[in-house]
């Protein structure tokens, strides 16, 4: 059994990097898709070998492989649209778990403490 090499495929796809990308993509497609028209020789080979053989023989359209690869890179269908919400609804939802506490303006418990504005420390401690 002769091994398939990249030199065999270089006549169809001259760039080796593109060859690897297209052959990988086609091999994944072969792996997921069950084909009934495979020959006995292809049935015992692995999908990457089958992909390289078909590319070298010209059985696979390089333009179709390129288009499939480009479509796989598009993210438009994967991005979810942004739905704008009212900000006041968001604030109400965030604080629903807090208990209701009355806060008055009585600061009588702070009368005996003097704070500095710059450091926030007590004068009495110094």
Curated annotation (Swiss-Prot):
Family: Belongs to the RNA polymerase subunit omega family.
InterPro entries recorded: DNA-dir_RNA_pol_omega (IPR003716), Pol_omega/Rpo6/RPB6 (IPR006110), RPB6/omega-like_sf (IPR036161)
Cellular component, GO, one term: DNA-directed RNA polymerase complex
Superkingdom assignment: Bacteria
EC number: 2.7.7.6
Encoding gene (name): rpoZ
PANTHER family documented for this protein: DNA-DIRECTED RNA POLYMERASE SUBUNIT OMEGA
Catalytic activity: RNA(n) + a ribonucleoside 5'-triphosphate = RNA(n+1) + diphosphate
GO BP: any one term: DNA-templated transcription
GO molecular function, one term: DNA-directed RNA polymerase activity
SUPFAM superfamilies from the UniProt entry: RPB6/omega subunit-like
Subunit and partners: The RNAP catalytic core consists of 2 alpha, 1 beta, 1 beta' and 1 omega subunit. When a sigma factor is associated with the core the holoenzyme is formed, which can initiate transcription.
Coiled-coil parts of chain: none
Its job: Promotes RNA polymerase assembly. Latches the N- and C-terminal regions of the beta' subunit thereby facilitating its interaction with the beta and alpha subunits.
Stated name of the protein: DNA-directed RNA polymerase subunit omega
């Amino acid at each position: 059994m002769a091994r398939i090499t990249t030199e065999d495929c270089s006549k169809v796809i001259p760039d080796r990097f593109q060859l690897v990308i297209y052959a990988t993509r086609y091999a994944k497609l072969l792996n997921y898709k069950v084909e009934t028209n495979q020959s006995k020789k292809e049935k015992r080979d692995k999908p990457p070998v089958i992909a390289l053989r078909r590319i070298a023989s010209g059985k696979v359209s390089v333009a179709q492989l390129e288009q499939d690869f480009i479509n796989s890179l598009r993210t438009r269908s994967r991005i979810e649209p942004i739905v704008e919400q009212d900000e006041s609804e968001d604030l109400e939802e965030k604080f629903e778990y807090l208990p209701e506490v009355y806060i008055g303006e009585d600061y009588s418990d702070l009368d005996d403490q003097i704070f500095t504005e710059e450091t926030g420390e007590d004068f009495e401690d110094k």
